[in-house]
Amino acid sequence: MHGVYRRPSGRNGSAEERIDWRIAVMSAQTIMDYPFHVGGRTALGLRGHVHYLALGAAEKIFFYGDAPRWLANLPTNGLPVLRSTRLFKTADLGIESLAAEPDGNAILFLQNWTIRASTPERAILEALDELPDNDSFHNIDTIFEGLTNLRPRRVTELLAACTKVQVKRLFFVFADRHEHAWLKHVDRSVIDLGSGDRSFIKGGKLHPKYRITIPEEYIPGKPEGNDGP
């Protein structure tokens, strides 16, 4: 059985003594060959698409696939959240190796390791799957605003392989809202959006085109509110 050893830390377990979660992930992926990846909001953050920090709590780190259970018990500077890869029919579609930014961490810089992480096209779908319990419409909307360079062919492939109708409908709710140039090149004919209305959030309003309940301010033509991060 694979495992890790860590030198006992100081009595108080200060933040400085905690393991950089990226080092733990790269060790599990590269040295121990565990088949999992970093995804969702975490992958979007690694790729520069998240510009806010969680206040008052450790940052959630989203892992997808067969991540080792001991990873969740390590005293890292993140809070691991384990997810399956069932959101897609093809489990490894839209996953690429990403060089870690050194930002002062000599180990990351010298070892030249990479992290297996979702591409932005996959990561935004994983992030949408966290609504409404583990993320907010405001945060997703802010992230979507910056997704100006998604690859339409990859978007099409991932949406066609996505197994959750509500995630696909939500994607188009935000995509239509922001009208990035790549959207007109997405082949909607191969994407199954299901049929019928979907009740997604309590007290929401039904989107007139995508037939899913969402906060009223995200309905086209409605005044915008701010539900906070």
Regions found by a protein language model. Name each.
Residues 1, 56, 204-206:
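Short, ordered beta-strand-loop transition motifs
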Residues 1-35, 148-175:
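Short beta-edge/loop segments at beta->alpha junctions of small alpha/beta modules
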Residues 6, 62-64, 211-215:
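Residues in well-ordered beta-strands of folded domains
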Residues 13-15, 32, 68-74, 220-221:
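Short, surface-exposed beta-strand/loop "edge" segments at domain boundaries and coil↔beta transitions
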Residues 15-17, 23, 39-42, 103-104, ...:
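A short linear-motif detector with a strong N-terminal bias
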Residues 24, 46-51, 197-200:
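Intrinsically disordered, low-complexity boundary segments flanking structured domains
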Residues 35-100:
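Exposed, interaction-prone assembly regions rather than primary DNA-binding/catalytic cores
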Residues 93-229:
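Hydrophobic alpha-helical interaction segments
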